[in-house]
Amino acid sequence: MSSLSCPTYRSRTSSSSPFLSNHHHSSLINVVDPRRSLSFHYASPQGLNLAELCVVRSQRRSVQSSVVVQDGSVATESSSSEEAKDVGVLTIPSLEADKVVAESDGGEQLSTVSITVVGASGDLAKKKIFPALFALYYEGCLPEHFTIFGYARSKMTDAELRVMVSKTLTCRIDKRANCGEKMEEFLKRCFYHSGQYDSQEHFVALDEKLKEHEGGRLSNRLFYLSIPPNIFVDAVKCASSSASSVNGWTRVIVEKPFGRDSKTSAALTKSLKQYLEEDQIFRIDHYLGKELVENLSVLRFSNLIFEPLWSRQYIRNVQFIFSEDFGTEGRGGYFDNYGIIRDIMQNHLLQILALFAMETPVSLDAEDIRNEKVKVLRSMRPIKLEDVVIGQYKSHSIGGVTYPSYTDDKTVPKGSLTPTFAAAALFIDNARWDGVPFLMKAGKALNTRSAEIRVQFRHVPGNLYNRNSGTDRDQTTNELVIRVQPDEAIYLKINNKVPGLGMRLDQSNLNLLYSARYSKEIPDAYERLLLDAIEGERRLFIRSDELDAAWALFTPLLKEIEEKKTTPEFYPYGSRGPVGAHYLAAKHKVQWGDLSLDQ
């Protein structure tokens, strides 16, 4: 669990506050955050401190913040911190904030947040969702009044749920003396209700339990759907009609996959919107919550040395690389319905590409950022099958251990052509990126586990030192590498002179290794995304038109692969992948950066 700390007060708006509903809008007083002197350069791991993270978050919103002002004066968003001091800002601790705002309206009704994990007995809930919620509680990021309910078909008591959840909670980094005490307090807030996902009756019973724990407070409810996609709509229908909040907000987090193609994705969206508004649907892609992905826009827009270079004039190619060193063991049946393109490329890598390539947004508001991402996706050239290589891992022995092939998995149909590896060259047809290849590569059962972005710059025209750097010009390419996982890092490859007599060049790294630079543990992506969902911050969630544009790009390719029954190229388990991926890169005059010695 990461070391975090949370703000002393939070921004309160009709759209984003987890503690207020429309009931309190008339009583709000606008005020500037007294800590507005913080710079947006505040990027990365001090951004690991959620106190500063939330302050920066409140600064970048176009909406206004609200706290109570001592003399009743109004300080607007545009006010300076000195002006805020003049009117007398009263600092409100986060756990007392909802009480103060409620009292400012002359009432005594407090608010609460009820979080229901639908599919609570599944692996995702146990390994990611409950630990992330505990991390937020441990750092004081959850409101004073909150309740967590597990909901699943499995028969289980509250005590049994707590035992199950407790096995995955940890304070491994911080080693604070009150860790056990915090765990005990958190588990007391966790309850369980057994029910079918398509049963109105069972969700009515859940609603009654939620009301008992909400105790008449203003209720805000978050449902996390950690269930198979074929039962999303049933669960949403029941939750919306039988267990949604009547006086606060109701939000639903939906896990991928969001369909298999444009048609099924559109049908899913249409079905969800029968019961929810678009702003109630939080489509989660956990890669967007990873620290280095979130830092991507900060790196670009807050550092003058990068933004002027961020175009076809200086960048030769961009690579988005995802690799896992294990196969589909245990979940091959599920994976076979989707394949690596749907599982990784169409969502994780494409979302990162859109963030990387977008134009400067009007602001850091969620809608402005997502508008720019959609423009990128709509500008992308249709993907040709000739610019794609697919592969499937086969059995291979390493160090005396024999690893299975994909089709050795008993849950995978014999003779399956589902790719476990894919590489593709994509292009953006706009003025900034015309002609620049964006290469994606994703695979399972490879030689390493990693996720990274590699930006290879153009060669220096008329380079005076070509004679000193050998015949392979690619060896002297400047390259910016953003390593998302593991061992988060940002490094820039530069050429420099080797010390000594004579003139010999060497390539070295200017390296920001997060673990060496920052003592705090990086928060898990689910911590950030859950906190965003509670606060109503949508910047890292996928909007329906983004989803439509992403599927419009990949659906024709997937259809062609399946109709032609394209045979994947086999590669040994634990290798670098199929040889065809190297030919694809060479076709576009590119070398895969992850094959270099810096790995």
From Swiss-Prot:
GO terms for molecular function: glucose-6-phosphate dehydrogenase activity; NADP binding. It catalyses: D-glucose 6-phosphate + NADP(+) = 6-phospho-D-glucono-1,5-lactone + NADPH + H(+). One of its GO terms (biological process) is pentose-phosphate shunt, oxidative branch. Its EC number is 1.1.1.49. Residues 1-18 have a biased composition (Low complexity). GO terms for cellular component: chloroplast; chloroplast stroma. Residues 1-23 are annotated as: Disordered. NADP(+) 2 binds at K441, R454, R483, Y491, L492, K493, R576. This is Glucose-6-phosphate 1-dehydrogenase 3, chloroplastic. The lineage of its organism: Eukaryota, Viridiplantae, Streptophyta, Embryophyta, Tracheophyta. The gene is G6PD3.
